């Protein structure tokens, strides 16, 4: 993965122009709450470099995965399995944010809003996930 924006407390793996944009809005919003988010663009959603992933998550205990499609069989499933296989989860918390029902139709932003994976809803979920208020 490629570091789009560096951070030190939470890492979020995502891909694609729309989701990167949403993550950068999320990063700015969370910065105001005192959280420092690292944003990673995954050019390949089904193959991962062990050394690269180790470097990305080093010293980070909260891992998020964001994708704008169905959860089952997506990057979140694959990356979570990869992390577990290589014993990289340890005490880290991991959360997958994706679409868990048949996707609604509309503009990209309308779909994100409906499924609550837009930056405002994600911020609330991440704050609860991190138990930081």
Where are these regions (language model features)?
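Thiamine diphosphate
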Residues: 1-133
């Amino acid at each position: 993965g490629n570091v789009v924006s560096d951070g030190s407390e939470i890492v979020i793996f995502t891909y694609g122009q729309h989701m990167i944009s949403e993550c950068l809005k999320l990063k700015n919003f969370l910065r105001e709450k005192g959280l420092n988010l690292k944003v990673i663009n995954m050019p390949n959603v089904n193959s991962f470099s062990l050394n690269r992933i180790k470097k990305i998550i080093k010293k980070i205990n909260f891992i998020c995965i964001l994708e704008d499609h169905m959860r089952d069989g997506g990057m979140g499933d694959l990356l979570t399995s990869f992390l577990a296989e290589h014993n990289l989860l340890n005490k880290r918390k991991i959360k997958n944010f994706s679409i868990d029902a048949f996707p609604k139709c509309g503009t990209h932003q309308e779909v994100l809003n409906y499924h609550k994976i837009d930056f405002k809803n994600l911020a609330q979920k991440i704050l609860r996930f991190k138990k930081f208020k």
